[in-house]
């Protein structure tokens, strides 16, 4: 079929579906109407195609309209409306139903789906917003509120607007993008990797990682027919799919109740339903009022409450990136995600496949709105594998999360009385099949998860914990059958065919005894046995709950559908409510038993006596005397730093979200250079300690602030610290030794954090093991010894997950069936104060470096040193670690930190002491002289490269003798290994042993070796010139300059200073913005984007907008979100901005687009809607701690006090610069001061930054723009994520010492302006 014949082609499918194609050429017309031939990328031009799967609802069975007369839908109207949406998203581009690429000329590549894969993640992310815009365009200004469900028999009732005459609206089931590339030159398939994400046109859409399917077209006139695959077959749905998952149940105690009441600090508690450990502590709610669906809903009115903070984690060999967060949604009730952890283990034979796998996880976590705070990359040597186990053909991952419950753990344990309860399905019942040849089975939508988390959090906060009867807690299996059983508890489910997904009922025949077996098989294969990324929520039926549920889920763009109602009989009953044509006599229902695993829980105790066999016996060839070819010490040491496991992780850390939630007190970057070497992370659960009881806060009622309300310091805050440990190079050979080393690494890393006692630490164990004969006994014995090891160390132990790397009962799994053994320890503990922590950057000159190993032995087996030496077989044996000594060592480190005897510290692991000291010197920008103790026997390289777990501490010279004396009194093994130097231009790294010099080189050379792998990975990013952008301008010590002395004001919210905070679809709850507004004294009101017209009244003085980059293409997401907000509230934002007594503040590219489209008055010669945010030159998401200069002449009222100041601030996003139709327009904004803030160099004398990454876009370094009168301000740097000083990764030198974050002054100046302009 050629392109012209598709102009009116609406291919009808089952259920009245049709796939409609649209084309967007990205070139200007050349001579004769032909595309111009350019020098870009093999002289390519690109045409973006859209394949839209519409459901016109004219036929079909089992849909929501079954049994009713369906209104006719005009496909032409839907097509024209969708083209209007594309013109809004892509202004200035031609949009049509016909391809403009020439037929029969040149050669083509296309990324069109061929049926082996499914639509990319971006396709699923934008479909809900496009559906909302489609409804608005077709219905015009008609406001229609349809009820979520309408089953009067179950207490649902009829909602407003039900039964009214409405315009029929087709449903957008999926939107798929494809590129067609045309060239006069010959292009081949192997160019696809280079071309996929390197298209320069602004209409080009960023790919989802793994979406590389460019193929040549045989006939240039043939356009690809997109095939939409939705749940074609069940995957991994066998009831015995993961028989090892039950093992953690053996190591949990279920006889302890959850403690309640008011306590100071936190208390370690145990969940009575699943035995997991957590910390009961005070949590903070930034706002208690939410305006949704034309009504203000309030919770208990208290800014804080008690909840449980806990951690989950799991190792996956084939599941999607965010599978853990779906399956663990109800572990301690419903929990918010405070921080994410990411670890990847793979082979070094194909680094680009490993990078592709890693990028998919980075994108999914970034789009979820939760910061990624910890992680690791373990690159294995494929030539050295344990006996009986081949090298892993594909990488596997560890995903962890720190969560905070907002309700107590719940399960439906008794029948429901009154109006009953209903089960709702959150998310899209969608399963993407594995792409042929792909690196992983599926890719999750982070945006969809963000909408689910934000919607449920808001619903529970507003409706109350009693509104939720139960949450899905399906830990062992992810099938819909298991999730329904978990959501229903002791009760059953009654549902109807009209409530099930179309895919589940499209092939059902009429219900009759003869068809019962076939229908049951269809429902099992297409629904009950399908693993779909959805969450089930059981809600008590009340009119208020239904109203809140409908409004909240529409606000956050979360798809929700009624799945059924609770019934007394514990079974699933499906009623056929289709048209009478399907009635053939007999019962019109089918019954299914509730899900019961085919294996008993808990497992039999006999497995505890099973023998345990180490995988690698201590005999030849693993104890071979051949130590490998000799190598120069210098090359070996630098080679260790170049190893992917040890080397710099900038290619990961600088391209994930690290702070958007505003609750992060420690992320991966530390020191003045923001180097990714942190040993632990920390999230804050109570960002403000509140005023002392003896002081009266100010309420902003008087012009002058009382003197006793001025404070020049910030209070300590409480939170939760986390640390990871893994030794997957050793674990496959010696599981017990590898597990103990991983536990030791996590505990010692956490000892550097500001925790109070080692007894507060809880270690979570995650395990993957091949399900072979005797596996249960081996795993049980291993976990028993790990738990005993933790008890000896004085820490608690949680076994969170145990997964089979090869599943039984279903043949080889899609991920290849590799026999993988993997182990990760994740330690966490409550901290009463986020200050007084030890970070790996050296702080002082002439300090002493002490090395405290966890064992006197030297570990070399499977070390990075042996891998660098090129040994084909690992030699030696693992080091033996005592649990009791580990606990004693951790307590000693805590004592040295508490007494201020140590000022910095770093854990010793991969790469040994040498790698740890090199990272400390680079992070602190200091010279370092390392002294190998002369009294040690053997090769000094063995001491420097030993990977025995331990800690390296920096102790001031004045405190060195006291520290050493204390360690000796506690019988702690301690080595004095070095002395720090000064910060000089030529920093040196020197290693000696007596008179022998082992290494002497400049630190620049050391840093170059350490960054080499990261630079290599950055080169293969989505930009041709990526290799030309280095980190040089970023890795300079920054200085600040203040125009005033920073302070904070002890205040309480003033109800007359009310600010509306916009809630946007697909975005997480704006915690950072609400925290900053409430702490600074504003009365913050969270407002749905559907209800702005009812909120922006005279009682509201300000509007705050904060969005996140929640899709793989920020430009598309920003344009769609802005179009949706303004179409739902026509003229509302423009009228609010035009009032003289209001202000607005926007943070991020999405907020800029919304306010710009609201006609923010910028300049008579430049309309705000003509200003656009431009992408970073890296074409990647950037997370940077950058210097920002406040224009001395800016009229911005928010920057009145900060004018002329140079301050560091977080800047995150893909679009971190501004563009205009002509460069002169922005130049005039800079001259007039409307360029309120600018990206700057390392100090004031450096001037505006012009090079990446200090200026991410390498254009005019404008970071903020204000209106002519200064009332409205949009920023690309996040002042809410820098509002507290504990959010700063490093406090720079300044002309005025910084003890309070100066960014608080932005909100204080806005208060002063509101007071001066109030009526």
Swiss-Prot record:
It is found in: Virion tegument. InterPro entries: Class_I_gatase-like, FGAR-AT_PurM_N-like, PurM-like_C_dom, PurM-like_C_sf, PurM-like_N_sf, Tegument_herpes_virus_N. GO terms for cellular component: viral tegument. It comes from the Viruses. Pfam families: AIRS_C, FGAR-AT_PurM_N-like, GATase_5, Tegument_dsDNA. GO terms for molecular function: phosphoribosylformylglycinamidine synthase activity. Keywords: Virion, Virion tegument. The keyword Membrane does not apply. One of its GO terms (biological process) is purine nucleotide biosynthetic process. Gene3D superfamilies: 3.40.50.880, PurM-like C-terminal domain, PurM-like, N-terminal domain. This is Probable membrane antigen 3. It comes from Equine herpesvirus 2 (strain 86/87).
């Amino acid at each position: 079929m050629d392109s012209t014949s598709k102009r009116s082609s609406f291919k009808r499918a089952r259920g009245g579906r049709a796939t409609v194609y649209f084309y967007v050429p990205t070139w200007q017309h050349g001579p004769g109407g032909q595309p111009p031939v350019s020098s870009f990328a093999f002289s390519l031009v690109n045409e973006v195609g859209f394949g839209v799967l519409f459901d016109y609802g004219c036929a079909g069975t089992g849909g929501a309209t079954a049994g009713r007369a369906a209104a006719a839908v005009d496909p032409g109207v839907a097509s024209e409306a969708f083209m209007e949406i594309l013109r809004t998203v892509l202004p200035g581009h031609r949009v049509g139903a016909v391809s403009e690429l020439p037929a029969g000329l040149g050669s083509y590549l296309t990324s069109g789906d061929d049926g082996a894969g499914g639509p990319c993640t971006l396709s699923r992310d934008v479909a809900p917003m496009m559906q909302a815009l489609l409804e608005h365009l077709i219905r015009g200004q008609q406001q229609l509120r349809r009820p979520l469900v309408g089953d009067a028999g179950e207490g649902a009732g009829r909602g407003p607007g039900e039964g009214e005459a409405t315009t029929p609206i087709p449903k957008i089931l999926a939107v798929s993008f494809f590129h067609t590339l045309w060239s006069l030159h010959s292009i081949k398939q192997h160019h696809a990797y280079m071309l996929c994400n390197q298209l320069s046109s602004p209409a080009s859409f960023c790919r989802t990682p793994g979406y590389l399917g460019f193929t040549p077209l045989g006939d240039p006139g043939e356009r690809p027919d997109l095939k939409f695959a939705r749940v074609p077959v069940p995957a991994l749905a066998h009831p015995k799919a993961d028989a090892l998952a039950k093992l953690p149940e053996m190591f949990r105690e279920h006889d302890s109740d959850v403690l309640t009441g008011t306590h100071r600090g936190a208390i370690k508690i145990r969940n009575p339903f699943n035995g997991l450990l957590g910390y009961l502590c005070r949590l903070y709610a930034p706002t208690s009022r939410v305006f949704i669906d034309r009504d203000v809903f309030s919770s208990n009115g208290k800014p804080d409450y008690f909840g449980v903070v806990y951690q989950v984690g799991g190792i996956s060999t084939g599941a999607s990136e965010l599978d853990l967060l779906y399956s663990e949604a109800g572990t301690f009730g419903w929990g918010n995600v405070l921080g994410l952890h990411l670890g990847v283990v793979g082979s070094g034979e194909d680094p680009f496949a490993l990078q592709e796998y890693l990028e998919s996880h980075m994108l999914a976590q970034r789009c979820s709105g939760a910061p990624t705070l910890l992680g690791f990359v373990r690159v294995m040597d494929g030539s050295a594998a344990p006996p009986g186990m081949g090298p892993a053909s594909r990488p596997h991952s560890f995903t962890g999360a720190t969560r905070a419950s907002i309700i107590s753990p719940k399960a439906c344990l008794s029948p429901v009385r009154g109006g009953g309860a209903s089960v709702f399905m959150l998310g899209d019942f969608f399963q993407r099949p594995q792409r042929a040849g792909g690196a992983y089975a599926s890719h999750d939508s982070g945006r969809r998860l963000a909408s689910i988390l934000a919607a449920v959090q808001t619903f529970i906060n507003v409706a109350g914990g009693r509104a939720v009867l139960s949450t899905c807690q399906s830990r062992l299996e992810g099938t819909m059958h298991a999730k329904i059983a978990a959501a229903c508890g002791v009760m059953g489910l009654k549902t109807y065919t009209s409530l099930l997904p179309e895919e589940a009922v499209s092939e059902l025949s009429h219900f009759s005894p003869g068809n019962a077996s076939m229908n049951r098989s269809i429902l099992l294969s297409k629904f009950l046995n399908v693993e779909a990324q959805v969450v089930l929520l059981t809600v008590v039926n009340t009119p208020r709950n239904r109203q809140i549920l409908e409004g909240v889920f529409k606000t956050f763009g979360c798809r929700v559908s009624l799945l059924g109602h609770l019934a007394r009989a514990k079974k699933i009953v499906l009623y056929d409510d289709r048209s009478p044509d399907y009635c053939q006599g007999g019962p019109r229902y089918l019954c299914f038993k509730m899900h019961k695993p085919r294996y008993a829980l808990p497992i039999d105790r006999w497995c505890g006596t099973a023998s345990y066999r180490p995988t690698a016996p201590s005999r030849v060839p693993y104890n071979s005397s051949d130590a490998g070819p000799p190598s120069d010490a210098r090359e070996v040491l630098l080679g260790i730093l170049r190893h992917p496991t040890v080397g710099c992780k900038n290619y990961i850390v600088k391209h994930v979200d690290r702070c958007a939630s505003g609750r992060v007190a420690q992320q991966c970057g530390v020191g003045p250079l923001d180097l990714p070497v942190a040993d632990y992370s920390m999230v804050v659960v109570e960002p403000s300690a509140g005023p002392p009881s003896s002081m009266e806060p100010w309420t902003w009622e008087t012009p002058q602030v009382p003197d006793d309300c001025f404070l020049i310091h910030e209070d300590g805050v409480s939170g939760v610290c986390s640390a990871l440990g893994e030794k997957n190079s050793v674990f496959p050979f010696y599981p017990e030794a590898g597990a103990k080393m991983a536990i030791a690494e996590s505990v010692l890393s956490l000892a550097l954090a500001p925790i109070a006692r080692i007894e507060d630490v809880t270690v979570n164990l995650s395990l993957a093991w091949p399900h072979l004969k005797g596996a249960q006994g081996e795993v049980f014995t291993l976990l028993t010894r790990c738990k005993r090891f933790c008890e000896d160390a004085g820490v608690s132990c949680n076994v969170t997950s145990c997964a089979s790397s090869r599943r039984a009962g279903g043949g080889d799994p899609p991920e290849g069936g590799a026999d993988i053994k993997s182990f990760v320890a994740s330690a966490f503990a409550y901290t009463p104060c986020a200050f007084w922590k030890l970070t790996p950057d050296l702080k002082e000159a002439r300090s002493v470096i002490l090395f405290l190993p966890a064992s006197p032995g030297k570990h070399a087996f499977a070390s990075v040193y042996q891998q660098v030496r090129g040994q084909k077989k690992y030699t030696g044996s693992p080091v033996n670690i005592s649990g009791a000594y580990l606990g004693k060592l951790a307590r000693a480190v805590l004592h040295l930190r508490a007494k201020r005897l140590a000022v910095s510290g770093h854990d010793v692991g991969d790469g040994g002491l040498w790698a740890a000291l090199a990272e400390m010197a680079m992070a602190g920008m200091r010279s370092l002289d390392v002294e190998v103790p002369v009294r040690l026997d053997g090769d000094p390289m063995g001491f420097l490269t030993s990977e025995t777990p331990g800690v390296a501490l920096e102790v001031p010279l004045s405190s060195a003798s006291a520290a050493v004396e204390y360690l000796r009194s506690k019988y702690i093994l301690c080595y004095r290994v070095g002395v720090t130097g000064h910060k000089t231009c030529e920093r040196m790294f020197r290693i000696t042993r007596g008179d022998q010099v082992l290494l002497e080189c400049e630190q620049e050379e050391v840093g170059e070796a350490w960054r080499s792998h990261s630079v290599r990975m950055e080169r293969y990013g989505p930009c041709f010139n990526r290799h030309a952008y280095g980190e040089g301008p970023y890795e300079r010590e920054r200085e600040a300059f203040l125009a005033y002395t920073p302070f904070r004001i002890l205040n309480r919210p003033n109800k007359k200073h009310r600010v509306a905070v916009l809630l946007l679809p697909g975005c997480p709850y704006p915690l950072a913005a609400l925290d900053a507004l409430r702490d600074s004294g504003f009365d913050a009101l969270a407002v749905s984007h559907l209800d702005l017209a009812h909120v922006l009244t005279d009682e509201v003085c300000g509007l705050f907008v904060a969005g996140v980059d929640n899709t793989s293409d920020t430009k598309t997401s920003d344009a769609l979100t802005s179009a949706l907000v303004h179409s739902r509230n026509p003229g509302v934002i423009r009228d609010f901005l035009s009032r003289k007594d209001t202000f607005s503040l926007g943070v991020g590219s999405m907020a800029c687009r919304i306010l710009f489209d609201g006609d923010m008055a910028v300049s008579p010669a430049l309309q705000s809607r003509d200003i656009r945010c431009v992408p970073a030159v890296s074409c990647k998401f950037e997370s940077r701690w950058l210097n920002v200069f406040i224009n001395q002449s800016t009229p911005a009222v928010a920057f009145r006090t900060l004018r002329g100041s140079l301050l560091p601030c977080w800047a995150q996003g893909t679009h971190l610069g501004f563009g205009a139709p002509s460069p002169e327009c922005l130049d005039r904004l800079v001259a007039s001061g409307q360029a309120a803030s600018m990206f700057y160099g390392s100090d004031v004398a450096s001037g505006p930054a012009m090079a990446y990454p200090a200026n991410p876009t390498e254009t005019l370094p404008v970071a903020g723009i204000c209106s002519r009168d200064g009332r409205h301000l949009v920023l690309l740097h996040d002042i809410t994520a820098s509002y507290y000083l504990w959010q700063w990764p490093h406090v720079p030198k300044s002309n005025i010492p910084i003890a309070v974050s100066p960014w608080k002054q932005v909100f204080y100046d806005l208060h002063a302006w509101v007071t001066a302009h109030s009526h």
